């Protein structure tokens, strides 16, 4: 697995890269309006700038995925991990989690409770559910999440 920092061109292309992944992942969970809102919030050039200004790191996973994370002091927060269908079933999540743990801290994430594929992946890779919470994403959208943690050994 090769994790590479995003180039400026990667940031310009991120929205288009993520759109089909999000339609597949959340199309049965969210309305089209909410999907467009969240895609713009997280993956538009302006949206990404907001997160980069807060210290979020963006990495390409080979040519099949995206990782977004940030150092939160006591732990590393994995904000986004998405793979194209081509990148699934090849062990990328475990390699990503190993990389994040190598930064020296526990890894914490939020997972949409309705995203069963992601929740099962995290559980299979040693994450535990610490709590449930409802996250206000804006625009009238509230997300039922699991807060999950993988401890650094």
Name every feature range the model reports, one short phrase each.
Residues 1-3:
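Extreme N-terminal starter segment of soluble prokaryotic enzymes
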Residues 5-11, 15-88, 94-99, 151-152:
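Acetyl-CoA-dependent GNAT
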Residues 60, 107-108:
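A structural signal for short, well-ordered beta-strand segments and their strand-loop junctions
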Residues 91, 126:
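Short glycine-rich hinge loops at helix-strand junctions in the catalytic core
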Residues 108, 112-119, 123-125, 131-153:
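C-terminal "cap" of GNAT-fold acetyltransferases
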């Amino acid at each position: 697995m090769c994790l590479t920092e995003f180039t400026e061109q990667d940031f310009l292309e991120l929205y288009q890269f993520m759109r089909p992944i999000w339609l597949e992942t959340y199309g049965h969970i969210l309305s089209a309006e909410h999907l467009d809102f969240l895609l713009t919030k997280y993956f538009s050039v302006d949206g990404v700038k907001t997160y980069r200004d807060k210290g979020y790191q963006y990495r390409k996973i080979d040519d099949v995925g995206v990782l977004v994370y940030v150092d939160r002091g006591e732990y590393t927060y994995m904000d986004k991990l998405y793979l194209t269908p081509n990148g699934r079933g090849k062990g990328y999540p475990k390699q990503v989690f190993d990389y994040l743990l190598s930064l020296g801290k526990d890894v914490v994430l939020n997972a949409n409770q309705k995203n069963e594929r992601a929740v099962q992946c995290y559980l299979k890779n040693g994450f535990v559910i610490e709590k449930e919470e409802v996250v206000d994403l804006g625009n009238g959208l509230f997300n039922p999440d699991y807060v999950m943690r993988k401890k650094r050994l």
